[in-house]
């Protein structure tokens, strides 16, 4: 809940923080956004992470947390796509869209640098999950990357690319994922591909 999330992100004993928290349970409208750490200071939200040549992204990123229960504990052993993830509320999405649009404009953040924890740490993190509104953020708020849907519809009628493991690794790494192109379809590569699909094909 909101109170637990605030305590988790502000009490030093937990060793985790974020620049912003978007609550869930408040009846205030529009939904308030809590700034917990100044933009100019480091927050501890990404942990061991990488995007392109940058590692340890706490030092170079703004962290936004959204109160969400994720999935029930009994779904832990199920594949990610079979888990019953909690949807985000429309009030949360509106608050997130307004906040991220402001931050993107203020700091001139490119679309492909608006990322999930699962993008920058795919072997450790699954948030914000399959219900995160990437498409809505891109199309309605101008935030983040989303494919051109007309071009996407055309590509769906073409044969799937016959890339081997190295081909997939090279393309994932080129986009930004922390994948070492080795030609071996290892867990690092599988996790990066899952993260890419979670972002663009939830």
Regions found by a protein language model. Give the residues of each.
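Short acidic, glycine/serine/threonine-rich helix-capping segments at coil-helix boundaries
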Residues: 156-202
């Amino acid at each position: 809940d909101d109170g637990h999330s605030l305590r988790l992100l502000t009490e030093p004993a937990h060793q985790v923080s974020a620049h912003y928290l978007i609550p869930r349970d408040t009846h205030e409208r529009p939904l308030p956004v809590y700034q917990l750490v100044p933009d100019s200071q480091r927050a501890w939200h990404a942990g061991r992470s990488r995007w392109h040549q940058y590692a340890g992204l706490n030092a170079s990123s703004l962290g936004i947390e959204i109160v969400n229960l994720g999935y029930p504990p009994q779904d832990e052993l199920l594949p990610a796509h079979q888990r019953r993830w909690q949807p985000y509320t429309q009030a949360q999405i509106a608050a997130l869209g307004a906040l991220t649009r402001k931050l993107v404009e203020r700091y001139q953040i490119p679309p492909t640098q608006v990322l999930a924890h699962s993008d920058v740490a795919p072997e450790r993190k699954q948030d914000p999950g399959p219900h995160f509104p990437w498409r809505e953020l891109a199309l309605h708020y101008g935030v983040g990357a989303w494919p051109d849907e007309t071009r996407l519809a055309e590509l769906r009628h073409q044969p799937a690319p016959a890339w081997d493991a190295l081909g997939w690794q090279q393309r994932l790494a080129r986009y930004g994922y922390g994948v070492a192109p080795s030609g071996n379809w290892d867990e690092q590569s599988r996790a990066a591909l899952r993260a890419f699909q979670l972002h663009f094909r939830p």
